[in-house]
Amino acid sequence: MMGNKLTLPAELPDEQDLRAVLAYNMRLFRVNKGWSQEELARQCGLDRTYVSAVERKRWNIALSNIEKMAAALGVAAYQLLLPPQERLKLMTNSADTRQMPSESGI
């Protein structure tokens, strides 16, 4: 069954396409938990076909369902809508900030 494969998304989404960003992040967080679409749906109280359609960018999604999915995945709702490219920038900036004091000898 294709929807239950635990494979990471193949390519980064267009940062301007929120449905693509949401689909990418949902799948990324779901696969990292080792969950199938069916398990995510069960944890959220939603139908598996709904989760599948959202991951395939077929449907718009209500904010309340984004909140349910985020809670089930153990992340803040905004993280599902944050382009992965932005997450990488934030992580890089955070790492740079932590390194600055040691590099300057303070």
Swiss-Prot record:
**DNA-binding region location:** 37-56
GO molecular function list: DNA binding; DNA-binding transcription factor activity
Q: What SUPFAM superfamilies does this protein map onto?
A: lambda repressor-like DNA-binding domains
> What task does this protein carry out?
Transcriptional regulator probably involved in the response to nitrogen levels. Down-regulates its own expression as well as the expression of the downstream gene, glnD, which encodes the [Protein-PII] uridylyltransferase, a key enzyme in the nitrogen regulation system. Acts by binding to a specific palindromic DNA sequence (5'-TGTNANTNACA-3') in its 5'-untranslated region.
What superkingdom does the record give? Bacteria
Q: Is Calcium among this UniProt entry's keywords?
A: no
Instruction: List, alphabetically, the InterPro entries matched.
Output: Bact_TransReg_Diox (IPR050807), Cro/C1-type_HTH (IPR001387), Lambda_DNA-bd_dom_sf (IPR010982)
Question: Per the entry, what modulates this protein's activity?
Answer: Repressor activity is inhibited in the presence of the DNA mimic protein DMP19, which interacts with NHTF and prevents binding of NHTF to its DNA-binding sites.
For this entry, the protein name equals Neisseria hypothetical transcription factor
Subunit comment: Homodimer. Can interact with the dimeric form of the DNA mimic protein DMP19 with 1:1 stoichiometry.
Every HTH cro/C1-type domain range? 26-80
Keywords, ordered alphabetically = Cytoplasm, DNA-binding, Repressor, Transcription, Transcription regulation
Compartment annotation? Cytoplasm
> What induces this protein's gene, according to its Swiss-Prot or TrEMBL record?
Negatively autoregulated. Is most likely cotranscribed with glnD.
Any single GO BP term: regulation of DNA-templated transcription
Under the heading Pfam families, the entry gives: HTH_3
